[in-house]
């Protein structure tokens, strides 16, 4: 049984009070808005405008006596709020010690919270159709007072697909296959919520529960083929621009993703989906001193499933990957000099994750809850090197990120209001810990 802290009780009370204020109203599903259609051509738009208040209370990135923390850090740079609470001194007979706390409050808008997509469709024949989409996200519009100097736009997607009776050929910058099976599970609870903001004082708006079980697939240039669906089954494969990281050079081979999925509606209220995914990519680095070329293979497997019955939705998944972090393939994280996906010797670390969500929707109200965990296995190179009995070049690698959350939302036509709470815990291999509570309220307009 989980015992809530005083902070957790205050946040839960705030969310319960806010949730009661949402007004009962009919809801509809959003759809593309077609504003031009003629002679087999159509132009449509889709988008999202959102603003979320988020309060983060808990621990800042912890100190370490093992050189540096790798992975899991949430601050850029470190932000604390003085002496937050007194704790028992580990040295017997000594007075209590002060433990700094984190208190951050932001109104977030931009990035995931502000999107505009424009697409063009063309019917070449009755059985051959082309679809396309260019989706633009604003890097950040939270403030003009230096919370984020960069005000650029991010062309997140730019793809076209050719649908034929023999299958679909899709090309351009698009969501990658491996890890994308997390999305249907995450959306059960975080369709309109923020969750973990990735970095609490950085302007990005939403990581949801990614990093503690679910993966973020990411976007890159691809050539993808999808077979026709038969008895609910479909196979997809894609070759993609390879990922590179600090001190790694691009390889002569593209990354390969593949998926076998099952999607079947047994009635108007009963639908089942299953996703089995894999990824393979060679990575390489040339030692500038010895000119030695070192190669490795990023290899991962992923599986998830979602079942919808009437207003209920339940889903879960798991994965393991060599050369992945807790959030994505070949993850670097906040510290580019200490990436999570590989160590100082450029050996690839292995990570794994598990996650699940359940929710119920009635009259446009959705109440959902879930939990997840991700784990990182250190390499032999992560062991401390002792010099005079003191760790000299050692690191403390992230051991685990775990979380549980509750979200509540109300859809009113094209508007969606949300309230949420999340408890996030990081633990590193030498015992460093971090617990953070996230709470938020949001408003979304989507089309």
Cite the ranges covered by each PLM segment:
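Outer membrane beta-barrel
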Residues: 33-53, 77, 99-244, 252-254, ...
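Transmembrane beta-strand segments of Gram-negative outer membrane beta-barrel proteins
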Residues: 36-92, 192, 274-276
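Transmembrane beta-strands of outer-membrane beta-barrel proteins
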Residues: 43-51, 122, 126, 130-134, ...
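Transmembrane beta-strands of outer-membrane beta-barrel pores
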Residues: 51-57, 136-140, 175-177, 239-243, ...
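Detector for outer-membrane/organellar transmembrane beta-barrel domains
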Residues: 63-67, 98, 258-406
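Outer-membrane beta-barrel "beta-signal"
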Residues: 258, 410, 435-447
């Amino acid at each position: 049984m989980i015992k809530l802290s005083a902070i957790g009780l205050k946040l839960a009370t705030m969310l319960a009070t806010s949730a009661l204020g949402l007004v009962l109203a009919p809801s509809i599903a959003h759809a593309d808005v077609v504003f031009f259609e003629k002679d087999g051509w159509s132009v449509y738009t889709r988008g999202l405008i959102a603003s979320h208040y988020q309060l983060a209370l808990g621990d800042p990135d912890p100190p370490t006596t093992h050189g540096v923390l790798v992975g899991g850090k949430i601050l850029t740079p470190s932000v604390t709020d003085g002496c937050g609470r007194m704790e028992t001194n580990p040295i017997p007979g000594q007075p209590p010690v002060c433990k700094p706390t984190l208190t951050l409050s932001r109104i977030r808008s931009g990035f995931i919270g502000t999107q505009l997509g424009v697409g063009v469709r063309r019917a070449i024949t009755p059985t051959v159709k082309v679809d396309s989409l260019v989706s633009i996200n604003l890097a950040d519009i939270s403030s003009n007072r230096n919370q984020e100097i960069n005000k650029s736009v991010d062309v997140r997607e730019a793809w076209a697909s050719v649908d034929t009776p023999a299958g679909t050929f899709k090309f351009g910058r698009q969501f990658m296959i491996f890890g994308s099976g997390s999305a249907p599970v995450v959306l059960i609870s975080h369709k309109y919520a923020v969750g973990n903001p990735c970095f609490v004082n950085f302007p990005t708006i939403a990581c949801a529960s990614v990093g503690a079980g679910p993966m973020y697939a990411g976007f890159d240039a691809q050539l993808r083929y999808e077979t026709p669906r038969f008895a609910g089954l479909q196979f997809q494969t894609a070759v993609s621009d390879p990922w590179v990281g600090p001190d790694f050079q691009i390889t002569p081979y593209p990354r390969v993703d593949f998926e076998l999925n099952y999607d079947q509606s047994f009635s108007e209220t009963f639908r089942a989906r299953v996703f089995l995914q894999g990824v393979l990519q060679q990575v390489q680095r040339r030692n500038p001193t010895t000119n030695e070329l070192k190669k490795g293979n990023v290899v991962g497997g992923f599986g998830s499933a979602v079942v919808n019955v009437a207003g209920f939705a339940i889903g879960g998944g798991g994965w393991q990957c060599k050369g992945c972090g807790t959030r994505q393939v070949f993850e670097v994280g906040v510290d580019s000099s200490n990436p999570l996906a590989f160590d100082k010797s450029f050996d690839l670390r292995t990570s794994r994750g598990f996650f699940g969500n359940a929710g119920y929707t009635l009259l446009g109200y959705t109440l959902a809850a879930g939990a997840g965990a991700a784990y990182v296995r250190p390499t032999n190179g992560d062991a401390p090197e002792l010099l005079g009995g003191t760790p000299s070049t050692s690191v403390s690698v992230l051991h685990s990120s775990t979380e549980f959350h509750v979200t509540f939302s109300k859809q009113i036509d094209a508007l969606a209001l949300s309230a949420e709470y999340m408890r996030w815990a990081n633990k590193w291999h030498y015992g460093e810990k971090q617990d953070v509570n996230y709470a938020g309220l949001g408003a979304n307009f989507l089309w």
